[in-house]
């Protein structure tokens, strides 16, 4: 473990407490919590950043008003004060990660760029090859729109969205879909193809390439931070496991 991040378990736990955590698979998350607290202990963030962090949290959890917030707190079994502390903690983690890994963020982005592509596409799935061919020719000849045909014939959930899927990460769906979408042109309609048990007709609506903005930079820094934390936790557990299993003289 890094010299700057040592943990004296005796200051946190009795032997019974340690045993309880291990037996209930909580030890790893416990050590992680201590390490994160140590790492961000000297990080200070402005009131503006705190407010922004809470607003982002509300937005991402679709909390629009006080009533929504009250419901969220009730189902989460936490108080507003506890929620605010957790949001501030996460904001400090992001700030720490940005300060420490800022110079590595672009390299990680370039390595992850392909996986971060977003896509919007239209899809119709049917178990019948003949029907898939008929659908394809109707769209190609503009006899009927893909949206209308999706509602009529698609056997997947996309029938409820008029065939439209996305924006979603291009890697979210079937790997073969991602491969096809990457080589298609905007507006291009695929001929029927077999995907598992489905015959599919697909059209690329939009491919969204990621850009290295501040949000993405923060995401890359946070990913590197998470990896380092996991490595530190695993290293700590391994070393302590070796100590406990070492023969006594």
List PLM regions with ranges.
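PPIase-associated folding chaperone regions across multiple families
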Residues: 2-60, 68-127, 131-134, 148-151, ...
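Surface-exposed, Lys/Arg-rich phosphate-binding patches that contact polyanionic backbones
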Residues: 135-139
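Short, surface-exposed, charged loop/turn segments at secondary-structure junctions
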Residues: 141-142, 166
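Beta-strand-connecting loops/turns
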Residues: 142-143, 187
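Gly/Pro- and small hydrophobic-enriched strand-loop and loop-to-helix capping segments
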Residues: 155-165
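Short clusters of hydrophobic/aromatic residues that line enzyme substrate/ligand-binding pockets
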Residues: 165-168, 181
């Amino acid at each position: 473990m890094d010299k700057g991040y040592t943990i004296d378990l005796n200051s946190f736990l009795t032997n019974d407490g340690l045993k309880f955590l291990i037996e209930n698979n909580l030890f790893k998350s416990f050590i992680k919590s201590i390490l994160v607290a140590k790492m961000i202990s000297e990080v200070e963030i402005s009131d503006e950043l705190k407010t922004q962090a809470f607003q982002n949290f509300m937005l991402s959890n679709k909390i629009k008003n006080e009533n929504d917030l009250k419901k969220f707190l009730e189902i989460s079994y936490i108080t507003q004060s506890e929620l605010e502390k957790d949001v501030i903690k996460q904001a400090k983690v992001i700030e720490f990660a940005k300060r420490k890994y800022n110079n590595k963020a672009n390299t990680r982005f370039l390595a992850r760029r392909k996986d971060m592509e977003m896509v919007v596409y239209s899809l119709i799935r049917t178990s019948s090859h003949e029907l898939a061919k008929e659908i394809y020719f109707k769209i190609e000849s503009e006899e009927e729109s893909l949206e209308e045909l999706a509602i009529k014939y698609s056997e997947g959930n996309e029938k409820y969205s008029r065939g439209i899927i996305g924006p979603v990460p291009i890697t979210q769906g079937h790997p073969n879909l991602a491969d096809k979408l990457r080589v298609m042109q905007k507006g291009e309609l695929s001929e029927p193809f077999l995907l598992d048990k489905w015959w599919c007709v697909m059209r690329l609506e939009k491919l969204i390439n990621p850009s290295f903005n501040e949000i993405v930079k923060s995401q890359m820094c946070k990913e590197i931070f998470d990896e380092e934390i996991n490595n530190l936790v695993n290293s700590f557990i391994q070393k302590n496991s070796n100590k406990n299993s070492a023969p006594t003289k």
